[in-house]
A protein has these predicted regions:
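A contiguous, well-structured "functional interface" segment within a domain
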Residues: 1-2, 83, 89, 104
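Hydrophobic alpha-helical transmembrane segments
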Residues: 2-15, 19-70, 78, 96-120
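Juxtamembrane helix-capping/reentrant segments at transmembrane boundaries
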Residues: 80-96
Length: 120
């Protein structure tokens, strides 16, 4: 019985990821950026440490977007009317994603720009 509950928790988690991908344009954008970084990493032969950094950053951005989606969904479930506190909650959650994405982009530039310059 416990194994079934454990396996179901993975099923529910994957359903959440898939739902977020299907319904959120920003999640699609983050996944696209992740795929492009993976391709660039392969082509530019980034180091093992650089791969680890990229995977950590992928995890942070995707996790932040999933949490943002959950917060937005809960807020919308509670009220669809204009409400300043609901707006603050949604804006702050979106801001957390933006901070992660900007930080990840900066680190990505630090990793990839020298490699691109070396090719030129």
């Amino acid at each position: 019985m416990k194994n079934k509950k454990f396996l179901n928790s993975f099923k529910y988690a994957f359903n959440g990821i898939i739902t977020s991908f299907k319904t959120e344009k920003n999640m699609k954008f983050h996944i696209l950026m992740m795929v492009l970084v993976i391709i660039a990493g392969i082509l530019l032969k980034i180091s093992k440490i650089e791969w680890i950094i990229c995977v950590i950053l992928f995890t942070l951005v995707i996790s932040a977007e999933l949490i943002n989606t959950a917060i937005e969904t809960i807020v919308d479930m509670i009220t669809m009317e204009k409400n300043e506190k609901a707006k603050i909650a949604k804006d702050v959650a979106a801001g957390a994603v933006l901070v992660n994405a900007i930080g990840s982009a900066i680190i990505g530039l630090i990793i990839f720009i020298p490699k691109i310059i070396n090719i030129l």
